[in-house]
Regions:
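Hydrophobic/aromatic residues in alpha-helical transmembrane segments
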Residues: 2-10, 48, 188-195, 213-214, ...
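Transmembrane helix-loop-helix hairpins in multi-pass inner-membrane proteins
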Residues: 33-144, 224, 228-299
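Membrane-embedded helical hairpins/re-entrant loop segments and their flanking transmembrane helices
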Residues: 3-29, 195-211
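Transmembrane helical segments that form the transport core of multi-pass membrane transport proteins
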Residues: 158-161, 165-214
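Short, membrane-interfacial amphipathic segments enriched in basic
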Residues: 57, 139-160
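Alpha-helical transmembrane segments of multi-pass membrane proteins
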Residues: 21-30, 62, 206-217, 247-258
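Membrane-helix interface segments
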Residues: 16-25, 58-60, 95-98, 172-173, ...
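Hydrophobic alpha-helical transmembrane segments
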Residues: 20-25, 100-107, 174-179, 205-210, ...
Length: 299
């Protein structure tokens, strides 16, 4: 519900009027797509934008910009918590230096991508460079209908920049959407805390938060759908390292993943047929290479 509320706030900033009741199933399909595509938890974002654009008649560049803004707002608290986690694990866990370096590099990469995205949104010259770079790729790999596709690129990037500027400059981002993002991450950690309480274990929320953030970083690596297996293993390993028994760590992790991963996936997959076979095509495209995905997204 909170994910849906945040996206609704962003949509309203862009003049897209849609109720939470209508947005909620789209969000669930997006979450399910994130879980089944090895795209660093980003495979569901184009699907969300596509469904909203198709069903409500808004331009794709506008709906995609609201989805990107929503993802960026989710990234801000994650980066903040990731920095605190890297500092904290030096006290709670004895990790090899290369693991710490890898986590630091991952956070720096996320921050760099976020800065580039925002900079492209507010700087027309940089946006033009991105435009020209994409056009260069089109001319190199796509010979047929390249002029038409180039025009689509111009339209999408211009519309994306206009929408992002509008969203970024709106004070409701700071007053409502950003605080809501922190609340969402707090509830994510509290969910794990409640799972441990259900087993009669009182685990420090700090340890839970650190393990959860580390597992989330692993889950963003686009190797397995939703970080399947890797996230579970990391959570069990680090809970055990923190002094929690292996059996309790495994049981709590399985229950938590049933709630956060499998429940969301099943609900999203049950809702998916409602939106038709074209959405399945989008999900298939999300699993392909970045170049192919970008091309189909523009179409």
């Amino acid at each position: 519900y909170l994910y849906t509320l945040r996206w609704q706030i962003i949509n309203k900033m862009d003049g897209i009027e849609i109720s939470i009741r209508e947005l909620f199933p789209i969000v669930m399909v997006g979450l399910a797509t994130n879980n089944i595509t090895p795209a660093g938890r980003g495979g569901g974002e184009p699907v969300r934008a596509y469904i909203l654009s198709r069903d409500k008649g808004y331009p794709m560049e506008e709906t995609f910009a609201t989805v990107v803004a929503d993802k960026a707002l989710d990234t801000f608290p994650f980066v903040f918590l990731a920095i605190l986690t890297i500092i904290g694990i030096t006290f709670y866990f004895k990790l090899d230096l290369w693991i710490l370096i890898l986590m630091i590099v991952a956070v720096i990469a996320i921050v760099a991508c976020l800065i580039l995205l925002i900079y492209m949104s507010v700087n027309p010259k940089f946006g033009k460079k991105v435009d020209n770079w994409i056009i260069g790729l089109i001319r190199r790999f796509y010979k047929k209908n390249s002029d038409e596709l180039e025009q689509k690129v111009h339209t999408v990037i211009d519309g994306f920049q206009d929408t992002m500027k509008l969203v970024i400059s709106d004070k409701r981002i700071l007053h409502y959407a950003l605080p809501l993002s922190f609340i969402i991450w707090i509830f994510e950690i509290l969910r794990v805390y409640v799972v441990f309480l259900a087993f009669g274990a009182h685990v420090s929320p700090i340890i839970i938060g650190e393990v959860f953030i580390m597992a989330s970083l692993i889950g963003m690596i686009p190797l397995l759908p939703g970080g399947l297996g890797a996230v579970d293993g990391v959570m069990i390993l680090f809970y055990s390292t923190a002094g929690i028994s292996a059996s309790l760590s495994a049981a709590a992790t399985v229950i938590e993943r049933l709630i956060s991963f499998w429940l969301a996936t099943v609900i999203g997959m049950l809702i998916l047929p409602h939106y038709g076979s074209s959405v399945l095509d989008r999900i298939s495209l999300s699993s392909k290479s970045d170049d192919e995905s970008d091309d189909e997204l523009l179409e």
